[in-house]
Amino acid sequence: MAAQMYYDDDADLNIIQGRTVAVIGYGSQGHAHALSLRDSGVDVRVGLPESSKSRAKAEEDGLRVVTPAEAAQEADLIMILVPDHIHRDLYANEIAPHLNEGDALFFGHGFSIRYGLITPPEGVDVAMVAPKGPGHLVRRQFEAGRGVPVLVAVEKDASGSAWDLALSYAKAIGGTRAGALKTTFKEETETDLFGEQAVLCGGVSELIKAGFATLVEAGYQPEVAYFECLHEMKLIVDLMYEGGISKMYWSVSDNAEYGGYTRGPRVITESTREEMRKILQEVQDGTYAKELVEEFDKGRPNFLKRREAEQGEQIEKVGTELRSLMSWLKN
């Protein structure tokens, strides 16, 4: 089935301009959404705890800042843009008591809805607008008159017009300038988690560390191993980002291209693919979500232990020393 894409002509900005919006959170995505909504003529306020260090920044940016509860009470569209592990308690304590029939609850990621951490009441629209880029890029592109592609989904259309509202919101942050891709909360959440775990954050990191360790154990200098297995990764990824894997292979030497074709499949074997399928299954059946929630409910002991161990890896120490020589990284 062909992807369903929507653009500026498919969205009516007047719809979101007629709503009262609360953006909960002012991190990477929160600041981009709030500022772009404001610049699109939307009545927006930012919901942050009194103790939040981001309050001063949001106020400096000219936004009205209130507590999350006050924001939820004032608004009829609430966009939650705080870390996933905060959603459950934030929703129960600050947002749910102020939801009314006809309100809309929006998300930048589908985790809490997909795994039942939040169960919105009847009569409330539930939708997602998720830019496929970091907040600073979303904001920069908006200011330049362009946009970053967004994923848009509607989980519950209580009003009968939730889809139009979601597209209007996407237009207000520049998403429909580039294109809004229709998806579902299930698809966005499961593919996002799998991509992070098996490829982007987990898979690539472990591949780099394994390559580095293989060279060092064979007697090569750690500094040279770092250059070959980590530092040059950016060069390769940038080529893929610009033109896909084919452009990367077109750009590297024939030697590198042949080596990639013939040796790459020996690294990513059928056994590796089977583990990928297991990881996906754990995402799909809720095993991972249950593990994550339990870990954070306990105060993140294993998470913090692994973070500390990661920071002590030899590759991190070598990288710190080598990056100090790279003047272009200091700007």
Curated annotation (Swiss-Prot):
Can you tell me which residues bind Mg(2+) 1?
D192, E196
* Keyword NADP recorded: yes
Co-factor note (free text): Binds 2 magnesium ions per subunit.
Q: Please list the residues that bind NADP(+).
A: Y26, G27, S28, Q29, S52, S54, G135
| Pathway in which the depicted protein is active | Amino-acid biosynthesis; L-isoleucine biosynthesis; L-isoleucine from 2-oxobutanoate: step 2/4; Amino-acid biosynthesis; L-valine biosynthesis; L-valine from pyruvate: step 2/4
The Gene Ontology terms for molecular function here are: ketol-acid reductoisomerase activity; magnesium ion binding; NADP binding
- What does the protein in this record do? Involved in the biosynthesis of branched-chain amino acids (BCAA). Catalyzes an alkyl-migration followed by a ketol-acid reduction of (S)-2-acetolactate (S2AL) to yield (R)-2,3-dihydroxy-isovalerate. In the isomerase reaction, S2AL is rearranged via a Mg-dependent methyl migration to produce 3-hydroxy-3-methyl-2-ketobutyrate (HMKB). In the reductase reaction, this 2-ketoacid undergoes a metal-dependent reduction by NADPH to yield (R)-2,3-dihydroxy-isovalerate.
Q: Which family does it belong to?
A: Belongs to the ketol-acid reductoisomerase family.
What's the protein name? Ketol-acid reductoisomerase (NADP(+))
Organism lineage: Bacteria, Bacillati, Actinomycetota, Actinomycetes, Streptosporangiales
